[in-house]
Structure formats: C-alpha cells, structure tokens
C-alpha cells in the first residue's frame, strides 16, 4: 500500500500523535546524552507504549563511550594545528630542517585523515579504546507473524540526542557545514599531497617545480591550520540537541 493511498484522516492522526509524543519526550526527559539516565528513562517511556502492541519487549545492555565518535575532531584538529605551527617555528629558527618539518606534517596529517576516514566514513569504533565506557541500553520489541516466517523486517531508530553541531546550528542561512568541512578536509588532503611532493623533491630533480615546492609549499599548511580551528569548534559537547529530527522522528515513525 502506497503512502498516498492512506486516508488523510489516518495520516493526520499519526502525524499529530508523533508530534505530541516527540514534544512530550523532549520536555519531560530533557537532554538525552547516549547512555545517561534521561536517555534510559525515555526508553522506559517508549517501552510502555510498545508493550501495548508488541508480543514482547526487552532491554539489552552494552558498554559504549558517548564522546568517542566525535571527540576525534578535537584531537585531530589540535594535533595538526600544533604540528604545523610548531614545525614552522622550529624550521625558521633552524632547529629542524624544512625536510624534517614536511615529514612531520605529512605524518601527522596522514594519521588525522586516517582517523577521520575510520570514524566518519566507515563508522568504525577506532577511538573507543581511549575513552571511558558507560552502560547503555538497546530497547527491542517483537511482533510475531500469524503464519510461517519467510522474511524479517527490522525497524530501528535512536532516542538519544546528538551533541550540538555548531556548523549546522549557526549555518541556517549560510551553508557553514559544507564550507568549513570542505576547508578542513580539503585542506588536509592538499597539505598531505604537497608535503609528499616536497619530500620527494628533496631527493628527485623536479626542476623549477620541485624548487618551488621545497621553498613555498609549506605556506599552504597555514591555510590547513586555520581550517583546523573550525574543526575544533565543530562539536559543542556541553550542549545536547533536543533530538526531535535526529532521531525521535525515526523512533516514532
């Protein structure tokens, strides 16, 4: 049955119910950081509703690190920023050579990009071992079929709320998320490529281009360093969003 085939009265009833319950959860249980008491209390509230139409509901406990997923943005931004600035100071005071400075920046940026890819692209729990674990809960409900089981349908949502993303919060009219993330990630990629070329140019004759890369490519790293400031400011861990769209809508859908 297509969505357009549902009677408008049924659609309105469900929309009104969803809006009412989402508002109720936000007002009654407040900030729902992953694994905290508010989140668990809200799950118990959902369980009471699910008990009315499910054949069975249960909680499953597990260990998780609430800040591990996005706290890497703080770590990566600080380390890359400090590496670029510190190496620049050490290089221009002749404490280290330009080649060593490029090698350090190249290695640090590579590690930063690797962590970003593992966490943000592949959703691997790469940084979790570095963070404190707490007990959290999954809530599951089951509706049994009338006949033979031929296919299982899994519907999921999450009732916890995300930390505030400043790029989105302050970018309602200007696409700050796209601008700053392009600057941050794009700058890091370009810095890595330039540092590799500059390192190679120290050992392979690349003519005027190689000389230019050796002498001037480090200047671009400062653009990357400034981009890391925006990455550091990306997540506000002191503010938890209401979580209406992400993801109470999915929970009540």
Q: Over which residues does each language-model region extend?
A:
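Secretory-pathway/membrane protein signature
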Residues: 1-253
């Amino acid at each position: 049955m297509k969505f357009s085939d549902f009677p408008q009265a049924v659609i309105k009833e469900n929309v009104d119910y969803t809006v009412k319950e989402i508002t109720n959860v936000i007002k009654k249980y407040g900030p729902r950081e992953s694994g905290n008491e508010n989140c668990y209390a809200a799950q118990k509230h959902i369980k009471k509703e699910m008990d009315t139409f499910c054949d069975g509901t249960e909680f499953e406990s597990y260990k998780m690190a609430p800040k591990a997923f996005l706290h890497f943005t703080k770590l990566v931004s600080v380390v890359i920023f400090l590496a670029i600035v510190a190496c620049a100071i050490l290089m221009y005071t002749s404490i280290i050579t330009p080649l060593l400075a490029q090698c350090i920046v190249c290695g640090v940026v590579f590690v930063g990009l690797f962590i970003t890819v593992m966490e943000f692209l592949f959703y691997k729990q790469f940084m979790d071992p570095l963070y404190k674990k707490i007990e959290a809960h999954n809530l599951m409900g089951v509706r049994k079929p009338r006949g033979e089981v031929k296919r299982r349908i899994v519907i999921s949502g999450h009732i916890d709320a995300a930390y505030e993303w400043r790029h989105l919060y302050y970018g309602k009219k200007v696409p700050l998320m796209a601008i700053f993330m392009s600057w941050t990630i794009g700058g890091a990629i370009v810095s890595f490529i330039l540092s590799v070329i500059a390192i190679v140019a120290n050992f392979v004759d690349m003519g005027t281009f190689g000389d230019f890369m050796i002498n001037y490519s480090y200047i671009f790293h400062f653009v990357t360093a400034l981009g890391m400031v925006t990455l550091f400011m990306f997540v506000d861990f002191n503010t938890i969003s209401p979580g209406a769209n992400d993801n109470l809508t999915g929970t009540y859908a």
